[in-house]
Amino acid sequence: MASGYDFGWIPVLLSLFTLTDASSQTVNQELSNIFNELWKLDVNRMEPLTNYNISLQGKAGYIPQGSTNVVDHASSPLFVNVDEAKLSSITTYARFMKLLDNYERSTGVAERVTAEEVTENNSFLDAILETAVMKRAHQYLIGKGKSRSDLRQFKSQLYYMWFRLYHRERNGGEDSSGFEHVFVGETKFGREIMGLHNWVQFYLQEKQNLLDYKGYKARANDVPDADDHVLNVQFSWHGLVKPVASAFVGVSPEFEMAVFTILFLTSTEKTTTAVVNLDEYQLEMVVHRHGRCIGTAYPKLLSSNNRHM
């Protein structure tokens, strides 16, 4: 889970951010509509209390970016359990998980992509393009004039956006990609966590004792529930601390790829933000571009349990 806000992961929302008053936000109704369509089509979403269980424990305190002096308000992991057999049985998750060990964690260290890794990237895209979620996203983007109807061209567009390597640091070789940053996570100069906004990666890193959940982040009267699909959290990873991260929890990789791709392609701004009402949540969706590639993408949780209604 992790930049600005930055953490790609479990259908939970994790990321660095400032909590703002949801009532002051202007909702993008068009994006809300298409994202809710995709939400309903996401048959591969894991169900809380059935396919996974989380333990929220205590509310995390304030810690400045770059500091490692953190008080742990969670003595146990965030994820109590996840039905890994179910995850592995779903093609998009299975192929997604194969990509998580393909990257160098530190920025400034050039990535070397093998032929096998290129094949894995393509296999993952092939899998998500077969889902109803990505088919609807593709249809929407065609209607907006942002993507070609030819499936091969759309796949090439996705590959460039998400997997093309670029320089995140000026020194060294091509050291990053949108997929690595958002879904896998990176560290910068050994001082801060960037990206890592995905719940599956969060769970797997926690399981390996590489990531330590420190507690949830929320406004005074907006305490999260164990069945929430978006969370703000604090955690440490390889000895570094992410003060606030936001991420989806339980959602499928195709859902995250779809919503962030739509937000990216329907705007030309360096940083695009859009407030959307999604299911029972109000979110600020954020995408930062690195040329024609994804720089980062994450959701900020503004309110849950329909408190914004």
From Swiss-Prot:
GO cellular component: extracellular region
InterPro entries: ENDOU (IPR039787), EndoU-like (IPR037227), EndoU_C (IPR018998)
Catalytic activity of the protein: ribonucleotidyl-uridine-RNA = a 5'-end dephospho-uridine-RNA + a 3'-end 2',3'-cyclophospho-ribonucleotide-RNA
Cofactors named for this entry: Mn(2+)
Sample GO molecular function, one term: metal ion binding
Every EndoU domain range: 27-303
Presence of keyword Glycoprotein: yes
Chief location bin: secreted
Family matches, as CDD domains: XendoU (cd21159)
UniProt keyword annotations, A-Z: Endonuclease, Glycoprotein, Hydrolase, Lyase, Manganese, Metal-binding, Nuclease, RNA-binding, Secreted, Signal
One Pfam match: XendoU
Role of this protein: Endoribonuclease that cleaves single-stranded RNAs at 5' of uridylates and releases a product with a 2',3'-cyclic phosphate at the 3'-end. The UU and GU sites are more efficiently cleaved than CU and AU sites.
Complex formation: Monomer.
Protein family according to the UniProt entry: Belongs to the ENDOU family.
Protein name from the UniProt record: Uridylate-specific endoribonuclease C
The species this protein was found in: Danio rerio
Gene label: endouc
